[in-house]
From Swiss-Prot:
Names of required cofactors: Mg(2+); Mn(2+)
Protein name: Master replication protein
Chief site of localization: host cell
Misc note: The genome of nanoviruses is composed of six to eight segments. In addition, some isolates contain subviral DNAs.
Sites where the protein binds a divalent metal cation: E33, H41, D84
Function: Essential for the replication of all genomic viral ssDNA (trans-replication). The closed circular ssDNA genome is first converted to a superhelical dsDNA. Rep binds a specific hairpin at the genome origin of replication. Introduces an endonucleolytic nick within the conserved sequence 5'-A[GT]TATTAC-3' in the intergenic region of the genome, thereby initiating the rolling circle replication (RCR). Following cleavage, binds covalently to the 5'-phosphate of DNA as a tyrosyl ester. The cleavage gives rise to a free 3'-OH that serves as a primer for the cellular DNA polymerase.
Location of the motif Nuclear localization signal: 50-70, 96-102
UniProt: ATP binding residues: G186, K187, T188
Lineage: Viruses, Monodnaviria, Shotokuvirae, Cressdnaviricota, Arfiviricetes
Protein location: Host nucleus
Keywords: ATP-binding, Covalent protein-DNA linkage, DNA replication, DNA-binding, Endonuclease, Helicase, Host nucleus, Hydrolase, Metal-binding, Multifunctional enzyme, Nuclease, Nucleotide-binding, Nucleotidyltransferase, Transferase
Short sequence motif named RCR-1, residue ranges: 9-12
Length: 286
């Protein structure tokens, strides 16, 4: 059974009387048709003023078969007015207000232009929101991310040139550890710069499953640890990412691979003794 929605298509076989616009309806269009088997029926499309259940729709037009609208607004209206099977009509009631077509790409383009939030598409594009709410939220998040990243500016410090030089030479074993005990050395600003200029993966740490799920095979991985995280650093996930193979068990178990990953850690502390081989860490003092 369909969830409560605004837009409904319907078929009513062997109708006995014409239909009219109910107070709960915003728009109604239908016509009398004859199917291939010769059956006479109403074919129509309804836009409700608010979300309505299937049971609620059947109370409005008893005996009708209802389906949640699958295509676009314009397609549903056109299907209810097609000429090839028409006997009488079509009849329209209420106001048909063309809105953005219910296609995700067009909704995304509209969101990009207007800056609307995903929830604002519930009324205008009810079916797109029903099907793709999470996709729209993700897309809006990407727009916000791009806007934020474009505004990031970097005030260069001497130590940053040392990291730049290291990144010029690929090394499949090292972990670059940028250590600045005082704070205010520009570690986070430089991490943002690498996100902006090199599409780096950024994390402040956490559980292996969460980090593995979020990592999308970026070649440059950044861990920017707050001072308060010193006792909770997940050294294992740092090493797994550097090795270019990590298991993501969140939602769906999958092993992710990469032929090369560069890892940079930004911290106010040095790594705990014994967590890495000494020859694996390359320190840069901020």
């Amino acid at each position: 059974m369909a969830r409560q929605v605004i837009c409904w298509c319907f078929t009513l076989n062997n109708p006995l009387s014409p239909l009219s616009l109910h107070d709960s309806m915003k728009y109604l269009v239908y016509q009398t048709e004859q199917g291939e088997a010769g059956n006479i029926h109403f074919q129509g499309y309804i836009e409700m003023k608010k979300r309505t259940s299937l049971a609620g729709m059947k109370k409005l037009i008893p005996g009708a078969h209802f389906e949640k609208r699958r295509g676009t607004q314009g397609e549903a209206r056109a299907y209810s007015m097609k000429e090839d099977t028409r006997l009488e009509g079509p009849w329209e009631y209420g106001e048909f207000v063309p809105t953005i077509e219910d296609k995700l790409r067009e909704v995304m383009n509209d969101m990009k232009i207007t800056g609307k939030r995903p929830i604002e598409y519930i009324e205008e594009c009810c079916n797109t929101y029903d099907k793709s709410a999470s996709t729209l939220r993700e897309f809006r998040g990407e727009l916000k991310k791009k806007k934020a990243i474009s505004s990031w500016e970097l005030q260069r410090k001497p130590w940053m040139g040392e990291v730049d030089a290291l990144l010029q030479e690929r090394d499949g074993r090292r972990i670059i550890w940028v250590y600045g005990p005082q704070g205010g050395e520009g570690k986070t600003s430089y991490a943002k710069h690498l996100v902006k200029t090199r599409d780096a993966f950024y994390s402040t740490g956490g559980k292996t499953a969460d980090i593995a799920f979020a990592w999308d095979h970026q070649e440059l991985v950044l861990f920017d640890f707050p001072r308060s995280f010193e006792e909770y650093v997940n050294y294992g996930v740092i090493e797994q990412l550097k090795n270019g193979i990590i298991q993501s068990g969140k939602y769906q178990s999958v092993i992710k691979y990469s032929d090369y990953v560069e890892v940079i850690v930004f911290a106010n502390f040095t790594p705990r003794s014994g967590m890495f081989s000494e020859d694996r860490i390359v320190y840069v003092y901020a």
